[in-house]
Regions:
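Intrinsically disordered, low-complexity activation-like regions
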Residues: 1-102, 106-249
């Protein structure tokens, strides 16, 4: 089994990742970068339903920390285009299901890496949430659910990152849909759902995500400061050590 550093080094040298960085203003480039392969290739699409193939990608998505922040910088102009008025990320490519998914990944995943530690890391969250709701509305749901499991795994995170607990309830509903389509892809019932539950617990406790306070210029309460200092009870995704399958105290 490869260790984290080996996975990261292979990702940085992957030809589809490098090609995506040369043409970042393209939905296929966003998808290829996130999936570390040619997502237009039927064999690659099929492989993205295999948990053994997808598991190393979890390192890229959730354990890479700052190590890939510099690599993804070419996506910054495209991320910022999400807020352009009038809208510029439009047309057949961007308005397709794949295009909408790519915009979610730009707004929710890549923005956090491109702008880590600043308020801009969260500036595109509303765009990502609205797009996920659109992807799973009555009109688009069936088409969206045809996408590979790895892609579907990433979409609920845009809702889990919301500080509106109703969005997290929607995230759980989406996960239930994906479980029915891919019952053998255990990351949905496992890590995906567990992460949403943990995010819910934080919102129920504080009404917001305290680990964002510094970046957003918010003043932490005494209770929030105490929690942020308690690394053993602070989730990994908030900078602590608490595993994703354990409850917040």
């Amino acid at each position: 089994m490869l260790d984290i550093n080996e996975i990261l080094e292979r990702f940085k040298k992957n030809r589809f990742v490098l090609k995506a960085l040369q043409n970042p203003r393209s939905p296929s480039s966003v998808l290829n970068y996130m999936c570390s392969g040619d997502t237009n290739d039927p064999l690659v699409k099929k492989s993205l339903n295999n948990i053994n193939i997808v598991s190393p990608l979890l390192v890229i998505w959730f354990q890479s920390g700052q190590s890939l922040d510099k690599l993804c910088k070419p996506f910054i102009p495209t991320v910022r285009e999400l807020k352009s008025k009038p809208k510029t990320l439009i047309g057949n490519e961007w308005d397709s299901i794949d295009g909408k998914i790519a915009k979610v990944l730009l707004a929710d995943q890549l923005s956090r890496s491109c702008f880590r530690g600043t308020s801009e890391a969260f500036a595109y969250d509303e765009i990502a949430r609205d797009l996920v709701h659109e992807l799973f509305n009555e009109k688009n749901r069936n088409e969206t659910l045809k996408k590979p499991a790895a892609i579907l795994y990433l979409l609920p995170w845009a809702l889990a990152h919301s500080e509106n607990i109703k969005d997290l309830e929607s995230a759980l509903s989406i996960i239930e849909l994906t479980v029915k389509v891919y019952p053998e892809f255990t990351l949905f019932e496992g890590r995906n759902k567990q992460a949403v539950y943990q995010h819910q617990q934080v919102l129920e406790k504080f009404g917001r995500y305290p680990q964002r306070n510094n970046a957003l210029g918010r003043t932490s309460t005494v209770q929030e400061k105490k929690w942020l200092d308690d690394k053993a009870n602070l989730p990994i995704w908030a900078g602590g050590k608490l595993p994703i399958d354990q409850d917040i105290k």
